[in-house]
Amino acid sequence: MRGKLAIILLIVFFANPLAAQELTGTLQQIKKSGQIRIGYRVSEPPMSFLDKDGNPTGYSIDLCKSIVTEVENKIGADVKVEYVPVTADGRFKALSDNKIDILCGSTTKTLSRSELVDFTQLTFVTGASLMTLKDNNDHDSGGLDGKKIGVVKATTTAVELKKLIRETSIDAEVVLFNSAKESIDALRKKKIDAFSSDQIVLIGIAVKAHDPMSFEISDGVFSFEPFALAVRRNDADFRLVADRVISDLYRSKKIL
């Protein structure tokens, strides 16, 4: 009799919603609102960009779509996905101000940024490089004296580019832009001589261009850029969901 009573009590306990783990932080907010907001950069191929129909797409966007599926499983409900475009200099504030729930793009994980946001496991590794027009082959550091080099402001590439110029005593001018698109437009119009960004992004830009053979990309890199997705600080449960998805994808070899 006592054994039967114990079994009944266990069934009641585990059937009680209060016995289940309570949702907290971002997961709780997503279930309550019924939506998840994905922050992304609009011109950072192949990580995040707009397709021909104006829809967000890319490697990081695909990762975040997989995370959304796992979030739905975790909270036991379907959610609406809202894509929120962000800039390089406004992306972390968008997270801290609760305007987005996760940052999916080409964001480098650094210690200083970890004071502002939390990062997932690494999603990609690249390095900063240089792009020029093919009729201008001064893309090696030795040929940049007197040149103008464009870079997106509030990026690690901007920091590393200025460091490179300082340490090698190159007489080059750094020109800051709000986006990769603005930088490429300036390069095409020859307002700058080169554009510096993460090498994988430079390759993505060239591949997507209507005239990919017009660009020259330096073989070398001058920085180490480990990419990761970003979430709000001290939200371990939500970050764990994202980390689990990323880990499972790598183990499954769906991404290499």
Provide a role label for each language-model segment.
Residues 90-93, 104-116, 160-167, 188-223:
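A ligand-binding cleft/hinge motif common to bilobed small-molecule-binding domains
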Residues 37-46, 56-72, 108, 126-180, ...:
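Bilobed "Venus flytrap"/periplasmic-binding protein-like clamshell domains
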Residues 42, 124-133, 199, 206-247:
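Periplasmic-binding protein-like
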Residues 6-16:
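Bacterial N-terminal signal peptides
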Residues 21, 62-70, 137-138, 142-143, ...:
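Extended ligand-binding regions for polar small-molecule ligands
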Residues 20-24, 31, 156-175, 213-217, ...:
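Ligand-binding clefts/hinges and TM-proximal coupling segments of bilobed small-molecule sensing domains
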Residues 21-104:
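Extracytoplasmic small-molecule ligand-binding "clamshell" domains
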